[in-house]
Amino acid sequence: MVDAFVGTWKLVDSKNFDDYMKSLGVGFATRQVASMTKPTTIIEKNGDTIILKTQSTFKNTEISFQLGKEFDETTADDRKVKSTVTLDGGKLVHVQKWDGQETTLVRELNDGKLILTLTHGSVVCTRTYEKEA
């Protein structure tokens, strides 16, 4: 099922991203720059390992993980988190935990688009990606 997510995805729409970053404690200047960028997400699979790369003019990040196994992650806004990614009902569910806080990043496919729903407390952000040829 993970195979359906494999590919290169370009951001085409974003809703409530600034509020989401604000809830995480991201500073004003960083939020301004991050809000303007249109990142590309590259999802690859190598055996049991999934590689998720995010590339933009703001910052490039890369994580490698196996489903259901906790790993250390440094986020684009430099949070040091414990992350776990699972496959749940056709959705990739990525949970980040740090300092007693938790945020959830859910990736799902809908009409050929990758929908990323970010949740931190009561703040929900939706980012839509289209697959590049």
Swiss-Prot record:
Amino-acid positions noted as binding hexadecanoate in the UniProt annotation, renumbered to this chain: 127-129
Keyword Cytoplasm in annotation: yes
Q: GO terms for biological process?
A: hibernation
Phosphotyrosine occurs at 20
Could you tell me where this protein is found in the cell?
Answer: Cytoplasm
This molecule's function is given as: FABPs are thought to play a role in the intracellular transport of long-chain fatty acids and their acyl-CoA esters. FABPs are important elements related to the hibernating state in mammals.
> What is the protein's name according to its record?
Fatty acid-binding protein, heart
Tell me what organism the protein belongs to: Ictidomys tridecemlineatus (Thirteen-lined ground squirrel)
UniProt gene name: FABP3
